[in-house]
Amino acid sequence: MNKEDLKILRKEMGMLFQGSALFDSMTVLENVMFPLDMFSKASTKERQMRAEFCLDRVNLSEAGHLYPSEISGGMMKRAAIARAIALNPKYLFCDEPNSGLDPKTSLVIDDLIHDITIEFNMTTVINTHDMNSVMNIGDNIVFIKEGVKEWQGTKEDIITSDNQALNDFIFASDLFRKVKKMEVEELKEGHKL
């Protein structure tokens, strides 16, 4: 693969890093403009308009002038999502998108990733240990243990899976084990959940 091919490939991929990876010395708007400045041939005005559109899409239109140190963790994640979609990528890769966030903010981020995936017609790949995110966002789920694909299926399949490694991971807490037992019993009785 030559440099031009790599450049094309990079334009097609949006990246959402675990720690947001915003540049501290740049405003939120400048952070979102960064991939546009690197890879877009559009005018400065067009790049700024696209960045403002992306910030508006993640409900941060009023935060463009602020620096990462001046915004919350949830706002930083949303700014990172705006940056990840700035080039209108075909693929969005997310590494632990909810790390360090409270449960309520995590749901906001999950919903945003889900909605943007559909709206921008992207394929989104999420690496996470957060089963709430898996159940909120995932359509096709792959469980990897020690670098090996252990299981693949839908979120509906998780509940009834007999894969021991998957069950050990997901149902490690008493609460989740009880929920699974109740749901499996209801499914056996013919009730739809």
Regions found by a protein language model. Name each.
Residues 86-90:
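A short, proline-enriched helix->beta-strand linker immediately N-terminal to the Walker B motif
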Residues 103-105:
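Helix N-cap at the start of a conserved alpha-helix in ABC-type nucleotide-binding domains
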Residues 156-193:
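C-terminal boundary and immediately downstream tail of ABC-type ATPase nucleotide-binding domains
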Residues 92-95:
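Catalytic Walker B motif of ABC-type/P-loop ATPase nucleotide-binding domains
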Residues 67-71, 75:
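Conserved ABC ATPase signature
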Residues 26-34:
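Short coil-to-helix segment of the ABC ATPase nucleotide-binding domain corresponding to the Q-loop/switch region
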